Structures are given as C-alpha cells and as structure tokens.
C-alpha cells in the first residue's frame, strides 16, 4: 500500500506508518549505505543488506575521515557534502540520475543521509537503520529539525529497546516526515540482529528473503 496512511503491527517485526513499500521499487537503480559514527563500511548489517539486495547494486561507503585513516566520528558539516558527492559520482558511474538511488545507513550514517535529502539531494528513498533520535538518556536533545524537509519514501527500522529512541518516540517525531513513511520495530537495542532488519528492508522493496 505504497503512499497510503495505514497502521499495522504484530509479530516479531511490527510495521506502522503511512506507506507499506517504496512507491516504485522497480525504478531504484542502487542503494548507498553509510555506517554509524564509530563504524565503517564493513559493518555486518551493511554487508548483510548488500548480500540480500543482490543483484541490485549496493555501495557501502566510508565517510571521508575513515578514508584518511581517522577512526573517530565524522563531523556533520563534512559528512553531508561528502555523502552527496559520493552519491552523485556513483550515480554517474551507474549511468543513472541521482534520484534513482536509495540513500541511508545505520545510526549517524542514516541521519547524515536524511540531512542530505533534506538539503536537496535527490533520492528514490531513504533508509534509516537505528535512527539516533536523541542521545541515550537525553530525550529532549532531539535531532529532528530537518525532518519536515524529507519528502521521499522513508523506512525506519529500530530495536524495541533502542536507547537512542523508543518506538513511541520514533513514531511521534518521524511523523514530521511528509513523504511516505514506514516504521518497523524489531527485537533488540541499538544494534539489532541482522535477519529481522534485512527482512524489513526486503519487504519495503517488495521482495521476499531468499
């Protein structure tokens, strides 16, 4: 029911929101995935998603600080333009418009992708894995100012015990996204197991696990 505004839930993977799947998954030419602040492109969840989405092209990217050998967190003011540059360059390599790519990532990486889209980066959709709504224990320090400018289909997948945002908090605040939105809660915390996360992403793409 892409683009609709229904709510559903139940089982180990509980979906809710305003859109069941990507509006047109057949038009997606690739998926660009970014890591969390202290991780890299080889994070196991990103690797699992690349394998599951095959043969769809997937680019798992480092941020620029990792490319320079710095393992610390990247600054948003550096991460966002770098992400946009990589997305445009990869789209050119694939011979497609940047708007045919799904952008996203885990935690900090997903937030950077959402901010890039809010700043005008074209995208077919946005994938937010364990979105860091606020720092643990600081529910008033919200990272939501840009969300009203995210106008693309969005999937958010988070663990039910994630200290960076409870399911209720995410449902309330991500509702600011005007584009089609699907929220999925899976067992776990900020680093849920890969299988339910992969299953939620494949379902959003209108595909079944292998």
Role assignments for model-derived ranges:
Residues 105-109, 113:
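Gly/Ala-rich beta-loop-alpha elbow adjacent to hydrolase catalytic centers
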Residues 122-133:
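A conserved short beta-strand
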Residues 150-151, 156-158, 162:
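Short beta-strand/loop motif that positions the catalytic acidic residue
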Residues 160-165, 191:
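Acidic catalytic loop of the alpha/beta-hydrolase fold
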Residues 188-197:
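Catalytic histidine-centered segment of alpha/beta-hydrolase-like enzymes
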């Amino acid at each position: 029911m892409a683009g609709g505004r229904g709510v559903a839930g139940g089982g180990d993977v509980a979906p809710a929101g305003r859109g069941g799947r990507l509006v047109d998954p057949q038009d997606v030419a690739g998926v660009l995935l970014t890591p969390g602040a202290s991780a890299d492109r080889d994070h196991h969840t990103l690797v699992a998603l690349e394998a599951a989405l095959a043969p769809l092209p997937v680019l798992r990217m480092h941020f620029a600080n990792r490319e320079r050998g710095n393992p610390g967190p990247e600054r948003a003011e550096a991460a966002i333009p770098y992400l946009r540059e990589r997305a445009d360059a990869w789209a050119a390599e694939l011979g497609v418009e940047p708007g045919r790519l799904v952008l996203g990532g885990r935690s900090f990486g997903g937030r950077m992708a959402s901010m890039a889209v809010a700043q005008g980066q074209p995208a077919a959709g946005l994938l937010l894995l364990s979105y860091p709504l606020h720092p643990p224990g600081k529910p008033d320090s919200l990272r939501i100012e840009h969300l009203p400018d995210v106008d693309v289909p969005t999937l958010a997948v988070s663990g039910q015990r994630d200290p960076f945002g409870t399911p209720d908090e995410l449902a309330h605040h991500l509702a600011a996204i005007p584009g089609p939105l699907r929220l999925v809660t899976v067992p776990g915390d900020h680093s849920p197991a890969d299988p339910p996360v992969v299953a939620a992403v494949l379902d959003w793409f209108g595909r079944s696990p292998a």
